């Protein structure tokens, strides 16, 4: 039973759109080079992936003598998330937070398994209204996020556990490759 899941996941991982993964990597790299902040958000398992990506960008990419990667997750301040969710609407929990930290040159990375999470779409629209760039990670064919994001990575699956595994693998690959690039400076 367990091997069946791993075999299916391996087949799905082999179908990852590598050109899209490279585009995401390049967007994060350019953000690092201009000393911007990578701001990440998502819901549920995608919120955990957002926090994990920020952790890896903040720790795995540390190279002695080099500037640190700037990264923040809109999912990590739960009092603020719940205050905005309670006082306005859950679809506004990210769009109400981002003006506190967003600066020109920052990059928003949104993670939504379905690509249709209203709060992820709202914050993406806000960043674009400020002239900013949005990376969207999704699955299930991409949903609305795939066409909204400037750079879209759609996991080739419609099974949420696989979509989340692919997003996490992408995040690990990003951190490893960014650390290699920083070491090469």
What is the meaning of each model-derived region?
Residues 1-16:
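Generic N-terminal amphipathic, Lys/Arg-enriched alpha-helix
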Residues 2, 21-24, 50:
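Hydrophobic packing residues in well-ordered alpha-helices of helical domains and bundles
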Residues 12, 34-35, 104, 148:
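Structured helix-beta-strand junction loops
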Residues 16-34:
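A short, well-structured juxtamembrane/interface segment
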Residues 34-44, 108-110:
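Short glycine-rich or small-residue beta-strand-to-loop segments that form or flank ligand, phosphate
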Residues 46, 51-184:
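Glycine-rich phosphate-binding loops that contact phosphosugars or nucleotide phosphates
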């Amino acid at each position: 039973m367990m091997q069946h899941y791993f075999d299916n996941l391996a087949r799905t991982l082999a179908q990852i759109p590598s050109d899209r993964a490279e585009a995401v990597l390049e967007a994060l790299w350019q953000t690092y080079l201009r000393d911007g902040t990578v701001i990440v958000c998502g819901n549920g398992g995608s919120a955990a992936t957002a926090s994990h990506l920020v952790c890896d960008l903040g720790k795995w990419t540390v190279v002695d003598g080099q500037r640190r990667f700037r990264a923040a997750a809109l999912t990590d301040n739960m009092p603020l998330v719940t205050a905005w969710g309670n006082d306005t609407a859950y679809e506004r929990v990210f769009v109400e937070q981002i003006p506190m930290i967003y600066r020109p040159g920052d990059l928003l990375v949104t993670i939504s398994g379905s690509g249709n999470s209203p709060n992820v779409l709202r914050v993406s629209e806000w960043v674009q209204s400020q002239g900013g760039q949005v990376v969207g990670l999704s699955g299930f064919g991409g949903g609305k996020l795939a066409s909204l994001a400037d750079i879209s990575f759609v996991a080739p699956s419609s099974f949420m556990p696989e979509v989340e595994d692919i997003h996490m693998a992408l995040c690990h690959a990003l951190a490893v490759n960014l650390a290699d690039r920083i070491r090469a400076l």
